[in-house]
Amino acid sequence: MATFKKQIKISGQGIHSGEKVNIVIRPSGEEGIFFKRVDMANSGLISAKFDNVGETKMRNTTIGKIAGAHVQTIEHLMAALFMVGVDSAIIEINGPETPILDGSAAEFIKEFEKVGVVGKKPKKIIVKKEVIVRAKEVLKQLPMIVRMKLWLMNKIMGRKVDGFVKLSPSSDEKLNIKATLVYKEKIIGSQTYEYGFCQTKESYDDFVENIARARTFGKYSEWEYLKKRGMGRGANEGNVIALNDAGDGTLNELIWPDEFVRHKIIDAIGDMFTSGGFVVGNLESYKGSHALNNLVLKKLFSNPENYDIVEE
C-alpha cells in the first residue's frame, strides 16, 4: 500500500459542466482510492472500484450512483495514480467530475511528482484464466429502446458492433496492453498500439514520454451537439483533439499521428486500476470502451479461479 507524502491540490474545468473543479488529494492509511463530494452533505466516501462503477450517458468511467453522490471521468486521474504506484488516497472534490486539465494524464503526473510517494507497491492481481467480453453481448443486456438507438447511431456512423476486451495470463510480470481503434474517419483509420508496464523506472519514463500526453478526442460537430444538450461545455482545443467534419484532419495539432490510440492506453490503464491493484496479464482491446473494460474486470473477479492476489 502506498500513498502521497502530503496533500495535493489541483484545479481545472470539468469537461462536461464547464465549471471550475477543485480537488484535494489527501494521504490515507487505508487501502483504496476513495472520492468524497465536499459539495454534497453526507456524501460519504465513494469507492473507485470496478464494482462501484455506475451507468452514464457519457463516454467515461463514473463511480457512485448517477442519481446521488457520484464522480465521473475518473480514468485519467486513475491512470496517473497507477503510474506513480499510489493505491491509497482520499480525493475531496467539489463537483461531479474531475478536472479535464489538458485532456491527458500528463498534468496529473506532474503534480504527483512534486510531492512524492511513500509505502509499498500496490498488490498484484495475476490473471490465471482468460476472460473476454464482447460488445454484442453487452447490447443484448440493454433495454430494447436503448438497443434500437445504438443500432441506428452505429448504422448512421458506419460502425460495426464487433468490439471486445480480453484479459489473459501473461508470461511475464507486466500489464501488457494491445489497443486497436477502427474508425471510418481517415485521420484515424485503423490504429494499434502495444504497451507493457512492469513497475520499473524505465517503464514509467517510457509512459511519461510516449503515452501520458495523449489527449482525448472527438468530432467538432459532436462537440457542438453535446454543448447544446448541456454536456461538453468545458471542451476546447486545449484539452480535446477536435476532428473536422470531413474526418480527414484536426483543428488542433497532433502530438503523434497515432495519438488517438495512445490515449486509449491511458483509458485502459485507468480502468484496470479500478481493480484495486496492479493487474498482471495481457489486455487486448479491439474497438473497446470504458463499459467493456469494466465488464471484463467484473467477469475476472466473478470466479476466484480466474486470478491470484499477491501482496508486495
Description of each model-found segment:
Residues 1-87, 92-312:
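C-terminal regulatory domains involved in ligand/effector binding and gene-expression control
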